Amino acid sequence: MTLAAPIAVYVLAALAEIAGCFAFWAWLRLGKSPLWLVPGMVSLAVFAWLLTRVDADFAGRAYAAYGGIYVTASLGWLWLTEGQVPTRWDILGGGLCVLGAMVILAGPRAA
């Protein structure tokens, strides 16, 4: 099993989820226009659709593996969009999350 396809989908899903959630953050915390919610909701719908594209027998397993990718993507957002450099603890935690996601994705399954 190749991990490239699900990881690519998870990365795209993470970007869609973070962008959608940030639209709400911008509206509620940064005083942006409520119109920010329109692309935010579209982005969240794209996120949900993308998660259904992962070849997994159970939604919970797909979501659990996604979580590790999401944490790492969030740290990238923190750095690239918000200008806050992740700490070494952020990086260590993100790495552990990705490792956990890889274990979930690549672990053997009963036939």
From Swiss-Prot:
Domain of life: Bacteria
Membrane topology: Multi-pass membrane protein
HAMAP family hit by this protein: UPF0060
UniProt record similarity statement: Belongs to the UPF0060 family.
Subcellular location: Cell inner membrane
GO CC annotation terms, alphabetical: plasma membrane
InterPro entries xrefs: UPF0060
UniProt KW Plastid keyword: no
UniProt keyword Glycosyltransferase present: no
Protein name (Swiss-Prot/TrEMBL): UPF0060 membrane protein Pden_1837
Record keywords: Cell inner membrane, Cell membrane, Membrane, Transmembrane, Transmembrane helix
Bilayer-spanning residue ranges: 7-27, 30-50, 62-82, 91-111
